[in-house]
Amino acid sequence: MTDIFNITHSEEVFSSALKLMPGGVSSPVRAFKSVGGQPIVFDRVKGPFAWDVDGNRYIDYIGSWGPAICGHAHPEVITALQEAIEKGTSFGAPCVQENKLAEMVIDAVPSVEMVRFVNSGTEACMAVLRLMRAFTGRDKVIKFDGCYHGHADMFLVKAGSGVATLGLPDSPGVPRTTTANTLTAPYNDLEAVKKLFSENPDAISGVILEPIVGNAGFITPEPGFLEGLRELTTENGSLLVFDEVMTGFRISYGGAQEKFGVTPDLTTLGKVIGGGLPVGAYGGRKEIMSMVAPSGPVYQAGTLSGNPLAMTAGIKTLELLKQEGTYEKMGLATSRLIEGIMQSAENNGIAINGGSVSAMFGFFLCEGPVRNFEEAKTNNSELFGKLHREMIKRGVYLAPSPFEAGFTSLAHSEEEIDRTIEAFDQSFSVIKN
């Protein structure tokens, strides 16, 4: 590995970007605010690798923030897109590809009997919130501290992702009246949820959560937590919603609900199902989804929803994922990676705890365990920033925030895992003092 990179061109491009876009980026975390150093400007990606505009190559553990589960620019996905684009980029009308991808999602995800495609995970969560309220006739919703469900006003309360990265409790411009119906509880705390139901009888439309928190680092559900939420929502006539934008088709073909054996009423999806193109979806029981326009009165629409390119990329990606041994392969690679990272930290006297589920992983530089967002905030963010900068020098691209999960793909081989662990060994050795 090269010990240091020349990133002069990245510096020049980003300097220009600062004059053109707020913070120089189209999404806040990309600005490296929580890790320091120069944001890297990418030129191209392929397989497990990304190349910046200076020609430096990185082993990529962001994967476009989750969609690139088959590896970047998979040849079969590219070929399918090349064929599709010859027929046009968007129809603004029904297309065959919508039917095919819908069938695949319904076949895979236990809770989904009908599905509606949108253009982002945020859109999916906005729409599912409206649907929850309409179906139950109730206004309040419970979310969990550190869980991120997009940047809609109702969800910007104790949120994760970029909100956590920047240390914001909420966002200016969100009226208190908008968030008055958003109730929050610590993740993995069933008693707190029970208390909210007790204090708000017949008023809570549902509970929405990331079944594995990936936007406050990487936090897994304690045994019985998801099952307890299922029981509580059923008992109180409320809906359970899994935000599987991140976990859907990543930790298993049927997502977290298949992995943990807990079936919600509604599910939101994104990332993987678009194969790298903008996409989102929400689905669930027929009796609930039938309320969505034009079948029912709950309005939701989108100019590019269900466009043939995103549908095509999604179809090919799911076909690749359905092949035998896919998740076992990714799971073994990811387990070896996180075990190597933790061993390397321990060898250098650095406190760490972490874990992985299939092709998703994360770690905190603190004493563990981490079960919720408050505990996640004990992470040594300053040390993580130093680690991130050292890893960049050694050609490994981690999420530029301690509050984001990492992702592997089918393209990450033993060689990439070994080189990554070597880079961690070197980086931990540098930052420990």
Curated annotation (Swiss-Prot):
It catalyses: (S)-4-amino-5-oxopentanoate = 5-aminolevulinate. One of its GO terms (biological process) is chlorophyll biosynthetic process. The lineage of its organism: Bacteria, Bacillati, Cyanobacteriota, Cyanophyceae, Synechococcales. The keyword Cytoplasm applies. Homodimer. GO terms for cellular component: cytoplasm. Pathway: Porphyrin-containing compound metabolism; protoporphyrin-IX biosynthesis; 5-aminolevulinate from L-glutamyl-tRNA(Glu): step 2/2; Porphyrin-containing compound metabolism; chlorophyll biosynthesis. It holds the Pfam family Aminotran_3. The modification N6-(pyridoxal phosphate)lysine is found at K271. Its cofactor is pyridoxal 5'-phosphate. The keyword Cytoplasm applies. Keywords: Chlorophyll biosynthesis, Cytoplasm, Isomerase, Porphyrin biosynthesis, Pyridoxal phosphate. It is found in: Cytoplasm. This is Glutamate-1-semialdehyde 2,1-aminomutase. Its EC number is 5.4.3.8. Belongs to the class-III pyridoxal-phosphate-dependent aminotransferase family. HemL subfamily. GO terms for molecular function: glutamate-1-semialdehyde 2,1-aminomutase activity; pyridoxal phosphate binding; transaminase activity. It comes from Prochlorococcus marinus (strain MIT 9515).
